[in-house]
Amino acid sequence: METKQSIPLLMPYKMGPFNLSHRVVLAPLTRSRSYGNIPQPNAKLYYTQRTTPGGLLISESCVVSETSLGYPDLPGLWNRDQVEAWKPIVDAVHSKGGIFFCQIWHGGRVFHQDQPNGEAPVSSTDKPLMCKNMYGGQFKPPRRLRSDELPAIVNDFRIAARNAIEAGFDGVEVHGAHGYLIDQFLKDKVNDRSDQYGGSLENRCRFALEVIEAVVNEIGSDRVGIRLSPFADYMESGDSNPEALGLYLVQAMNKHGMESSTVTWLNLE
């Protein structure tokens, strides 16, 4: 009969500075229960029910700005009320011995509700999604971001990471996967730009690497994870050569001093 010590999932693991008692992780799960984009008190029960001593939890996606919501009633980390609302939730997870990372995210053209002031969602492209949104309707055509707008979005990720640490989280996971904004720059079946953020692998990866670098510089590499999905085509985000894309990203992070020994984890799907 197998013992706990012989089951890899149940064995301890050192993840950067964090000592995990096992390798079962709560994945980030969208809940759409944060009314007004503020996490509600019921989130404390939700997360503590899933906490074990030394276990790793990754929060539901937290949006980095009011123009990045994607889905309705998602929690944010761009203002003071949101930071304060997260604090008792994170404290409750820590009181049970959990290690809690916050996933920070921008939906880009995957936007299921109206933007502030009725503006179009933003993306690497102006190509609309052809699939249906969660309400059975059509996605609104996105507005192609100008290159001079991208530093502000990079800064939104940086501020969200800083706010996550202030709220008490142990670190953040940058969501660069599944057809959302960062992935919309990475994948050549979405990104049709001809500037320094499109075309070559180097150019298509530029925005992702700028985000990662800004977040690492803000909170430290041992508090940062990155989720990537070079092989997935969710939300019409396929790539013609996913192996080359994934390899380039890993090598580029290594070149920037962001290899697996400095970024807490790299989740490739």
Swiss-Prot record:
Disulfide-linked positions? none
Q: Which CDD domains does the UniProt record give? A: OYE_like_FMN
Cofactor(s) the protein needs: FMN
Which is one Gene Ontology cellular component term of this protein?
A: nucleus
Identify the InterPro entries for this entry: Aldolase_TIM, OxRdtase_FMN_N, Oye-like
Which residues are substrate-binding? 175-178
The UniProt keywords, alphabetically, are: Flavoprotein, FMN, NADP, Oxidoreductase
What Enzyme Commission number does this protein have? 1.3.1.-
Provide the top EC class: oxidoreductase
User: What Gene3D superfamilies has UniProt attached to this entry?
Assistant: Aldolase class I
UniProt lists the family membership as follows: Belongs to the NADH:flavin oxidoreductase/NADH oxidase family.
* Main function: Putative oxophytodienoate reductase that may be involved in the biosynthesis or metabolism of oxylipin signaling molecules.
Q: What is this protein called?
A: Putative 12-oxophytodienoate reductase-like protein 2A
Write down the species. Answer: Arabidopsis thaliana
**In the record, what lineage is assigned to the organism producing the protein?**
Eukaryota, Viridiplantae, Streptophyta, Embryophyta, Tracheophyta
